[in-house]
Amino acid sequence: KVHRPGPGANLAYAGPRLEDYKNCFSAKTAEAEAAYADLVGLIQALGGGKNVLYEQVLGSQMVADDFLRTMAVMLMAGCFDQLTGWNPHNYYLYRHPVTQQWSYLPWDLDVGFADKAFGKVPVIDGWHAAWPLPGGPPKPILENIVKDPKLLASYRKFARSILESYFRPEKLKARLSKLYALIEEPLRTDPFPPRRVTNPEDTGYESILDSIERFIEKRYALAAAQLKDPGERPKTISQSHRPPMEPQPGTLPHA
């Protein structure tokens, strides 16, 4: 589990010392505790190298198609606070005991569906659907995927399918309305302030719904256009952001 950034958290090789990686990779089982050398081997392999077919590297180390699909879902939902977004943390790595392939499992996805998050992070304009390289520190696995024509083509195929299957505005907004209806009454007595920590301008639950719907519409329109005509690779906006502490009941987070 990676809860905070540190050596190797962006899946970039940080040297041979296993202790360095333990600063951010927390083993959750006895098997994982004994497998730090294997983790470092994974990170080294994912770094690629000259005259290496990265499609083969990724496929030999990870469940590649699942990772590509996850990249697309995180982008469409604006989940920037994890490895395939801006910040190299908030994920688990799981290795299947039989296939020995690794899977990437993002977690703590509480800052999605918010553009200009915290008033700073360009979640839509800075995260190109056809060139999925957001800001933050370098992430070799994403860079190598984008540089590999077959992997990039596979990612775009998955992204188009996911966008049309799950992120069409009429579908997603209808689901949002149904989910809100389920919790509307309990929210009347909820002790937390009626705003999202990502959106300082929220003024109530109707405002929150409106900002989420605007995100859904803009993200879909731009992603559809970008996947239809990828164009040239854009420059990466190298901005990272650590979310503030979560608000406490009856209080607002500091500005």
Stretches found by the model and what they are:
Residues K1-A255:
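Phosphate/dinucleotide-binding and metal-coordinating scaffold of catalytic cores
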